[in-house]
A protein has these predicted regions:
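Residue-level signal for pocket-adjacent positions within structured domains
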Residues: 23, 28-31, 57, 95, ...
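Conserved Class I SAM-dependent methyltransferase catalytic core
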Residues: 74-185
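Residue-level detector of flexible, active-site-proximal loop/helix-junction positions
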Residues: 33-37, 168-170, 217
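Core alpha/beta nucleotide-donor-binding catalytic domains of modification enzymes
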Residues: 1-112, 117-120, 124
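S-adenosyl-L-methionine-dependent DNA methyltransferase catalytic core
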Residues: 1-5, 145-156, 160-163, 170, ...
Length: 257
């Protein structure tokens, strides 16, 4: 089963469909990961040992963009830990946004029955109201908790952990997108991990990436290239296909015009 993928999991149906379109040979389980029990996972894995698990939890709860709110998705890394404890892979890769490095565990006020106390706050711009949990204080950094739990998952399963912030623009992507990568190597293996070296040459710009796209006007949909690729990146992205998808312009209202 060298270089074969056992299964992938995704809750969002649209993301799952996109994954299946791009990776039709990989089994996609489109459901809540919490519903995947130990027996089901072991049955899908089979008898052979697992080499690698790649994943990450929803990034909204860790994002530095916008206002973070109380969100149980922030604790979904515990499901990742559960999968690791079942599959016991040689290596795992956990990825998330840079904001995860600054997020701390949050302690919420509770009533005498142990229920979280909420307060209603009004949005100054829209006037809409929303309930927020009342915060009593903050504790350790989430990243420290995650690294600690990954290092000692069970009494007989642990990983040597390394953590690094990488920027996609340093690896040939025309975008500044920083992400945290946590790599774990099982402690019983004599292996060392090194993160890839950043590209020293000129960074790929958006112009480098999409300057071969034809101009699209309002209420227009273009499905074919009208020019030759202008650099190696554009040739790579096209492959042997001259068809363009999702290259259209909608009809705008008066304010946008």
């Amino acid at each position: 089963r060298k270089n074969s993928f056992v299964f992938a999991n995704e809750l969002d149906p649209f993301a799952a469909e996109a994954f299946k379109a791009n990776f039709p040979d990989i089994r996609m389980i489109n459901e809540d990961i919490k519903q995947l029990d130990k027996d089901t996972i072991e049955q899908m894995i089979g008898e052979e040992p697992v080499d690698l698990i790649i994943g990450g939890t929803p990034c909204q709860s860790f994002s530095t963009v916008g206002q973070r709110v109380f969100d149980e998705k922030a604790t979904l890394y515990e499901e990742y830990l559960r999968i690791l404890s079942i599959a016991k892979p040689k290596i795992f890769l956990f990825e998330n946004v840079k904001g995860m490095l600054s997020m701390r565990e949050t302690f919420y006020k509770k009533d005498k029955d142990g229920n979280i106390v909420y307060e209603v706050k009004k949005n100054k711009e829209t006037g809409s109201e929303r309930k927020y949990p009342v915060v009593e204080g903050y504790g350790r950094k989430i990243i420290d908790i995650i690294k600690e739990k990954f290092a000692f998952i069970t009494d007989d399963l642990g990983y040597n952990i390394s953590c690094e912030v990488l920027n996609t623009v340093d690896y040939g992507v025309p975008e500044n997108r920083e992400r945290v990568f946590v790599v774990g190597i099982r402690k019983d293996l004599d292996m060392e991990w090194k993160y890839p070296t950043a590209i020293k040459a000129d960074k790929l710009s958006v112009k480098d990436a999409i300057s071969d796209l034809p101009v699209v006007l309002e209420n227009q949909n273009i499905t074919n290239y009208t020019s030759q690729p202008q650099n190696e990146y554009q040739r790579l992205m096209r492959g042997h296909n001259n068809v363009i998808t999702e290259h259209y312009c909608g009809v705008y209202g008066g304010k946008i015009r």
